[in-house]
């Protein structure tokens, strides 16, 4: 019943928005007007009513003046529910919300909640009208007075309610069915959209547009999360979850291949993806998939920790406040989730690392250095941590290892406010002790760093469980000088070797060692004010201590060879007074990389019995083969006897340690400058021709090295020789002094070499310093003397005599280790065989046999040459045949050796000769070399545990059917636990290719896997003939592509590189031989193999399809290698033909004449679009790529329609193709059909 409010004499009653429903009614205050007998009737033409979803009807009837029974209203009255009133007439809602008795009564009768009726939608209809009729008649029987309720049952009303109820029930059932159908359609539509996004994720697209792909996947996963939460189970749920996991694998693969900058930019997105999948879909994943996600999270956390540790304090502060901004940003984005789904997810929970120490006073020496690598963020063991005085050390910090993980604060303000409570203490991380920005002039600054630089590592205490108090120095040993110690920090024999090798440091023995001396003592200007500070104390070592020290020093060199380089250069420069040494105060620069020092420490030379020469802090031998260039007096020296094979072992060690050679090379270059100021040096390239050009192979040449008796006595008594720099103060003043890291050193070094060359050219050929004495024993013949050599040096031309080389040394003069000698030490090591005799000085001469393969070939007819001796002066052995071998041996291939030293040239030449012999044999049989990759090229393998049970049954049936065929393709290896499927057409390919090529099998798997596959493909052993190469170890997985990617090379492959063809599915594993490679499409038969490479969609096994043998990949590859073979042997001169040129020519024919423009493939504004893989592939196969359309463009390669370039191509009838068209053309070595890859509008 609608009643006008009291207090209104004339009230405008308007219900709904229909203008026809507005009438004027006169009412008295507080009552329904009797004079005008107003009744409200509801007239409608429809006989049905609208009910809510539940089918319930409110029985509250709007009563009229006659109870709805008179006035022609029979049949037109309807039952009004509160839902209809609320939805149809908004003005009525306040009354319903206030708890109107009609609504309360209706709900009480039906035992329903009050608020259930507020959710019904009502559609307004034209037929529903409210008409107010005025009547002058008196009140009829049954008419209600004000405040009364009609309790008399009206039969007509009851019948009306009963009919309406039945109608509502029928309509409600139909509506429920419609809603169910709509819900199913909506669900199916959402599933289809999600699946489309997940299936469209490809590896190439992720590499080109990582952020866009991640955004789409985030949106799809959010929608999938809602579906999973709203529906307990729905079709395709498991499929969508598996697709989500496959997409995550693809994204993770691309993320792991990024550089550090890209990882830092995309780590948030990656973390959100991992968290979303792990939190909401892990219950639908298998155990292995969960483990893989956990591994992804751990890798991401480790990379995040490393990035956090390397950031500056300001960056860390920004990262601390970032979650706060992220929360506010998230709150805004939650309201517009439909426009940007990915932004509504929570940020990743990365561990927060401490910033710079809040209590530490940082000075210039403790700030990070831009020239040093970032200090490691990994914590040290609690036993060696540093604590601040006054703060307790917890038991947990003393016993636990690993990074200290702080709980993540979800509230940004709370996280910032509690920061000082967390990180107020000194951190347990090693980064507390920050490195110095510049290299210290005092190598021993407390950190024991190798190379004269300040290390960021904390010195481990020799007392387990003890803590070093930061800011307090520990007492040093009495014999320890923090400012005058040598670079490698002389180590006492009591220091455990492992204690030093762990940190690549060496320090004096003490129960606790100093952390860092005062900053004042590290001032480099103090060295100028106190020249005596450069003196250092030499410690005595036993042979065992020397060996242990060598191990520590070598490990330090391996840790940071860059520091070693700086240290050596630092010791070389400087004035003479700074490098003065006395007999009792001679430096022992242990571990500076000198080859003599290292070999002696390893036991080849004894310290007690071998006199040493000190030159700029680096030790050398008094009995060196290389004397100075100013030798004029021949004197004999009694040298201490050593083991018979010491020199041979020494040279071999030199050959395998290039660091030693590099250090000696630098020393020789630096020493030549002051010496040439007062002496005329002998041209090392002239003297180098003696052993390289005149000593023939198979010749044993005893090399005696006599030295001065006085020199021997001096060295035996004191063990130290005076530095040659003391005898040349004038030359020292002319040397250029530069800091160790001064980049002008490189320019200066090249200037010295050019100056040396010009000076050597001006040297007279009859200089007395270049003369030597020659004596012959046995048969003597004249050698061919180069024009540069003194004609008075009577040397045998055929080189079949032995040479006895007498070393001539000046007393107190250090031998000149020239550049050419150090560059050719490996050549000498290959030619030298040492035999020493103990006894008198004449019997203790060093016998050196010089051998070369070239000389063996030139003089095979002199078997008695070993009985002949030739002695020449030591000045003629200053260099070991390097330049002469380059000029006389390399010949027309000299250009191939540019950039290699003579050590590498010898090895390359030896390998080259061997390969040329193999190649000539192949050419004689009209064959080339063919390298075949196994995995995903010739076959596809899968382990038993990777194959699903439903696929297992299919494979078993196929294998039974395959056994009846003459050539099988499917195998089940029980002993290896794996399935193997051969690529269609492989038997025909191997049979025909073996007639044209020497076949080689190559795999990244282990030997067991390679052997089994070779037996499978070549049961008789006639195709490969044992040429099987495996790069993996025994502990590696069977399928090599699951391992960490490695590179492949042609080691073990017959012939030269110019005659080798490679067939592989991966280009990146052949970085040095891409020009020899025929790239083929991966053969992925098993579903697990597709997932390994992040590919979506069903596999060949699931599709029950396979490649066509006559048109597949192997058939196309066979046609290519047959063409290469035909073109190769059509040339008359096979030595000038290269398969790489033939292959490149065949590739350029594939897409010749095509002009390609890429649309939505290469990011807009890319500075170097030609580096995109598709761009490079298209140009490699003959196409011309451009960034702008023109009339010559023939193809537009795109992923979608709608761009200007695509519209331009469609209007002009040009090809609009998918990127797969380029890939297909490259794989099949023929232009693919554009219609198969067309993108139609």
From Swiss-Prot:
Disruption phenotype: Grows more slowly and flower earlier than wild-type plants. ABA hyperactivation of stress-inducible genes.
Catalyzed reaction equations: O-phospho-L-seryl-[protein] + H2O = L-seryl-[protein] + phosphate; O-phospho-L-threonyl-[protein] + H2O = L-threonyl-[protein] + phosphate
BRCT domain location: 1146-1239
Annotated phenotype, changing residue 933 to A: Loss of phosphatase activity
Domain of life: Eukaryota
Biological role: Completely dephosphorylates 'Ser-2', and partially 'Ser-5' and 'Ser-7' of the heptad repeats YSPTSPS in the C-terminal domain (CTD) of the largest RNA polymerase II subunit (RPB1). Involved in defense response. Acts as a negative regulator of immune gene expression and immunity to pathogen infections. Preferentially dephosphorylates 'Ser-2' of RNA polymerase II CTD. This counterregulates the MAP kinase (MAPK) or cyclin-dependent kinase C (CDKC)-mediated phosphorylation of CTD in response to pathogens and upon perception of microbe-associated molecular patterns (MAMPs).
Stated name of the protein: RNA polymerase II C-terminal domain phosphatase-like 3
Bias (Basic and acidic residues) ranges: 677-686
Cofactor(s) required for function per UniProt: Mg(2+); Co(2+); Mn(2+)
UniProt subunit comment: Interacts with RAP74.
Compartments, record wording: Nucleus
Organism: Arabidopsis thaliana
Pfam family, any one: BRCT
MF terms (GO), sorted A to Z: metal ion binding; RNA binding; RNA polymerase II CTD heptapeptide repeat phosphatase activity
Gene that this polypeptide is encoded by: CPL3
GO cellular component, as recorded: nucleus
Keyword Zinc: no
């Amino acid at each position: 019943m609608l009643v006008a409010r009291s207090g209104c004499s004339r009230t405008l009653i308007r219900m709904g928005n229909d203008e026809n429903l507005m009438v004027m009614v006169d009412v008295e205050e507080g009552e329904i007007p009797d004079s005008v007998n107003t009744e409200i009737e509801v007239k409608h033409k429809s006989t049905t009513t609208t009910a809510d979803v539940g089918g319930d009807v409110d029985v509250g009837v709007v009563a009229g003046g006659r109870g709805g029974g008179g006035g022609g209203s029979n049949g037109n009255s309807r039952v009004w529910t509160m839902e209809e009133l609320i939805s149809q007439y908004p003005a009525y809602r306040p009354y319903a919300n206030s708890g109107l008795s009609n609504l309360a009564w209706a709900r009480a009768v039906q035992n329903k909640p009050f608020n259930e009726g507020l959710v019904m939608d009502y559609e307004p209809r034209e037929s529903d009208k409210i008409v107010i009729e005025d009547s002058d008649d008196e009140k009829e029987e049954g008419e209600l007075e004000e405040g009364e309720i009609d309790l008399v049952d009206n039969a007509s009303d009851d019948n009306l309610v009963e009919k309406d109820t039945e109608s509502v029930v029928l309509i409600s059932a139909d509506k429920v069915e419609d809603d169910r159908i709509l819900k199913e359609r909506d669900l199916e539509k959402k599933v289809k959209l999600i699946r489309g996004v997940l299936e469209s994720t490809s590896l190439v697209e992720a590499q080109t547009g990582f952020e866009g792909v991640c955004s789409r996947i985030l949106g799809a996963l959010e929608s999938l999360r809602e579906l999973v939460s709203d529906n307990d189970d729905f079709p395709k749920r498991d499929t969508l979850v598996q697709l989500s996991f496959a997409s995550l694998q693809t994204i993770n693969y691309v993320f792991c291949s990024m550089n550090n900058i890209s990882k830092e930019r995309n780590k948030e997105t990656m973390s959100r993806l991992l968290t979303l999948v792990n939190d909401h879909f892990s219950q639908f994943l298998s155990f292995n998939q969960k483990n893989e996600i956990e591994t992804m999270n751990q890798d991401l956390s480790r990379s995040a920790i490393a990035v956090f540790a390397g950031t500056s304090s300001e960056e860390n502060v920004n990262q601390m406040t970032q979650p706060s901004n992220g929360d506010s940003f998230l709150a805004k984005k939650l309201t517009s989730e439909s426009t940007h789904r990915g932004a509504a997810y929570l940020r990743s929970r990365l561990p927060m690392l401490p910033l710079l120490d809040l209590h530490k006073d940082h000075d210039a020496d403790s700030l990070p250095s831009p020239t040093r690598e970032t200090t490691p963020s990994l914590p040290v063991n609690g036993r060696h941590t540093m604590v601040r005085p006054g703060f307790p050390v917890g038991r947990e910090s003393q016993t636990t290892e690993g990074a200290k993980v702080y709980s993540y604060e979800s509230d940004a303000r709370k996280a910032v406010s509690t920061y000082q409570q967390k990180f107020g203490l000194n951190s347990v991380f090693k980064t507390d002790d920050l490195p110095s920005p510049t290299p210290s002039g005092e190598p021993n600054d407390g950190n024991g760093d190798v190379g004269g630089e300040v290390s960021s590592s904390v010195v481990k205490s020799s007392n387990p469980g003890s803590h070093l108090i930061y800011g307090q120095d520990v007492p040093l040993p009495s014999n320890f000088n923090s400012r005058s110690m040598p670079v490698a920090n002389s180590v006492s024999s009591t220091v455990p070797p492992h204690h030093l090798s762990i940190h690549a440091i060496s320090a004096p023995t003490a129960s606790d060692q100093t952390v860092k001396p005062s900053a004042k003592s590290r001032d480099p200007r103090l060295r100028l004010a106190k020249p005596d500070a450069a003196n250092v104390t030499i410690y005595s070592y036993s042979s065992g201590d020397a060996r242990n020290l060598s191990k520590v020093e070598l490990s330090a060199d391996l840790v940071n060879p860059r520091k070693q380089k700086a240290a050596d250069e630092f010791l070389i420069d400087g004035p003479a007074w700074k490098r003065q040494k006395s007999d009792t105060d001679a430096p022992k620069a242990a571990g500076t990389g000198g080859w003599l020092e290292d070999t002696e420490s390893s036991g080849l030379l004894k310290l007690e019995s071998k006199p040493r020469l000190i030159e700029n802090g680096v030790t050398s031998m008094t009995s060196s083969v290389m004397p100075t260039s100013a030798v004029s007096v021949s004197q004999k020296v009694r040298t201490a006897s050593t083991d018979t094979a010491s020199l041979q072992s020494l040279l071999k060690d030199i050959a395998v340690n290039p660091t030693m050679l590099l250090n000696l090379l630098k020393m020789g270059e630096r020493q030549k400058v002051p010496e040439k100021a007062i002496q005329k040096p002998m041209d090392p390239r002239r003297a180098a021709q003696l052993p390289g050009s005149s000593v023939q192979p198979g010749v044993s040449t005893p090399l005696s090295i006599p030295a001065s008796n006085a020199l021997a006595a001096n060295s035996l008594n004191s063990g130290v020789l005076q530095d040659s720099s003391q005898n040349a103060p004038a030359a020292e003043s002319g040397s250029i002094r530069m800091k160790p890291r001064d980049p002008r050193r490189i320019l200066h070094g090249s200037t010295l070499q050019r100056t040396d060359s010009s000076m050597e050219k001006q040297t007279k050929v009859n200089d007395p310093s270049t003369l030597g004495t020659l004596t012959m024993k046995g048969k003597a013949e004249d050698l061919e003397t180069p024009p540069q050599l003194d004609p008075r040096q009577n040397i045998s031309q055929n080189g079949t005599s032995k040479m006895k080389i007498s070393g001539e040394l000046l007393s107190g003069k250090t031998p000149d280790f020239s550049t050419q000698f150090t560059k050719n030490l490996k050549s000498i090591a290959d030619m030298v065989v040492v035999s020493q005799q103990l006894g008198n000085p004449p019997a203790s001469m060093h016998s050196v046999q010089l051998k070369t393969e070239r000389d063996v070939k030139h003089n095979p007819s002199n078997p008695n040459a070993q009985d002949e001796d030739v002695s020449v002066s030591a000045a003629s052995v200053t260099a070991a045949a390097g330049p002469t071998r380059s000029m006389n041996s390399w010949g027309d291939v000299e250009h191939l050796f540019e950039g290699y030293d003579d050590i590498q040239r010898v090895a390359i030449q030896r390998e080259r000769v061997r390969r040329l012999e193999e190649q000539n044999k192949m050419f004689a049989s009209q064959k080339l070399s063919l390298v075949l990759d196994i995995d995903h090229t010739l076959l596809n393998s899968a382990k038993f545990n990777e194959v699903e049970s439903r696929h297992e049954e299919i494979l078993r049936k196929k294998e039974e059917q395959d056994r009846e065929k003459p050539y099988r393709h499917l195998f089940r290896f029980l002993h290896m636990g794996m399935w193997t499927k051969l690529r269609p057409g492989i038997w025909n390919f191997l049979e025909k290719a073996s007639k044209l090529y020497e076949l080689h099998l190559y795999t990244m798997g282990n030997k067991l896997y390679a052997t089994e596959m070779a037996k499978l493909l070549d049961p008789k052993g006639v195709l490969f003939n044992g040429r099987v190469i495996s790069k993996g170890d025994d502990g590696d997985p069977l399928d090599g592509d699951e391992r960490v990617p490695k590179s492949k090379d042609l080691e073990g492959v017959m012939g030269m590189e110019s005659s080798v063809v490679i067939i592989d599915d991966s280009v990146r594993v052949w970085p040095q031989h891409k020009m020899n490679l025929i790239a083929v499409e991966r053969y992925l038969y098993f579903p697990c193999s597709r997932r390994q490479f992040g590919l979506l969609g069903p596999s060949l096994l699931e599709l029950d399809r396979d490649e066509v043998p006559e048109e597949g990949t192997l058939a196309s590859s066979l046609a290519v290698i047959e063409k290469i073979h035909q073109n190769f042997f059509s040339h008359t001169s096979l030595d000038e033909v290269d398969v790489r040129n033939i292959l490149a020519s065949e590739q350029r024919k594939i897409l010749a004449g095509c002009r390609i423009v890429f649309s939505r493939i290469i990011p807009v504004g890319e500075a170097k679009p030609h580096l995109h893989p598709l761009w490079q592939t298209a140009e490699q196969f003959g196409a011309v790529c451009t960034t702008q359309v023109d009339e010559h463009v023939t193809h537009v390669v795109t992923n979608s329609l709608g761009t200007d370039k695509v519209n331009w191509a469609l209007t002009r009838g040009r090809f609009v193709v998918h990127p797969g068209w380029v890939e297909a053309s490259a794989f099949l070595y023929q232009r693919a059909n554009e219609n198969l890859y067309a993108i139609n509008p």
